[in-house]
Amino acid sequence: MGQKIHPVGFRLGITQEHQSRWFAEPSRYPELLQEDHKLRQYIEQKLGRLAQNNAGISEVRIERKADQIDLEVRTARPGVVVGRGGQGIEALRTGLQTLLGGNRQIRINVVEVQRVDADAYLIAEFIAQQLERRVSFRRVVRQAIQRAQKAGIQGIKVQVSGRLNGAEIARTEWTREGRVPLHTLRADIDYSYCTAKTVYGILGIKVWVFKGEIIPGQEVAAPPPSTRDRDRDRGDRDREPRRRQQQRRRQQFEDRSNEG
């Protein structure tokens, strides 16, 4: 049943980590869980896809220590979150403290997403934005898959459901490139879901990204170099013999100078 279960929840404790890491008394657990939902909802409203300044928020991780809350905001555009001179992150902290009330200390750590085109949520968000602009879903999905493949992933699957291109009858279409082994527990699979609100109704977008297998005791293999890196390395190799010739000529000139 690997095709049906949530890929992230299926791998918690194996290859995936919890987004909220804290312990609480059973009586306080519902209250703190609701606080986590409010924190993520507030950050999504201020910096998410529908905000004026879209920072490309991929994930928000929450840790609690006594009266202190540590937030780790993974974003594609950290400059938008931090703001000029740190004004943006300070305004975000003040807004969160006002939302929760009380003497809560909130620490915000902004982490930049290294491979934006390989992040499942950012891919789903990109597809949703294009669908809301009435772009053909097949063109959008093909473009998103090509960008993800250039980022060095091993497989991707994209599913779009709803009244596609304004059709009278809703349907579901999906496209897969490469391997997406949902039954393999050691597979590092990133999954996300996003909705696009169009004039014809709501479209659901699901994205599965397979980044490789995580085997205990082995380091995670680095992603393959991009086309730009390969071209730069090839240029360095082409220039290397020329540098050696210049060094040899310089050495011969110095030898003649010493003889004279």
Swiss-Prot record:
Residues 39-114 form the KH type-2 domain. Residues 227-243, 251-260 have a biased composition (Basic and acidic residues). GO terms for molecular function: mRNA binding; rRNA binding; structural constituent of ribosome. InterPro entries: KH_dom (IPR004087), KH_dom-like_a/b (IPR015946), KH_dom_type_2 (IPR004044), KH_sf_prok-type (IPR009019), Ribosomal_S3_C_sf (IPR036419), Ribosomal_uS3_bac-typ (IPR005704), Ribosomal_uS3_C (IPR001351), Ribosomal_uS3_CS (IPR018280). Pfam families: KH_2, Ribosomal_S3_C. The keyword Protein transport does not apply. It comes from the Bacteria. The keyword rRNA-binding applies. CDD domains: KH-II_30S_S3 (cd02412). Residues 219-260 are annotated as: Disordered. Coiled coil: none annotated. Keywords: Ribonucleoprotein, Ribosomal protein, RNA-binding, rRNA-binding. GO terms for cellular component: cytosolic small ribosomal subunit. Belongs to the universal ribosomal protein uS3 family. Binds the lower part of the 30S subunit head. Binds mRNA in the 70S ribosome, positioning it for translation. HAMAP family: Ribosomal_uS3_B (MF_01309_B). Part of the 30S ribosomal subunit. Forms a tight complex with proteins S10 and S14. This is Small ribosomal subunit protein uS3.
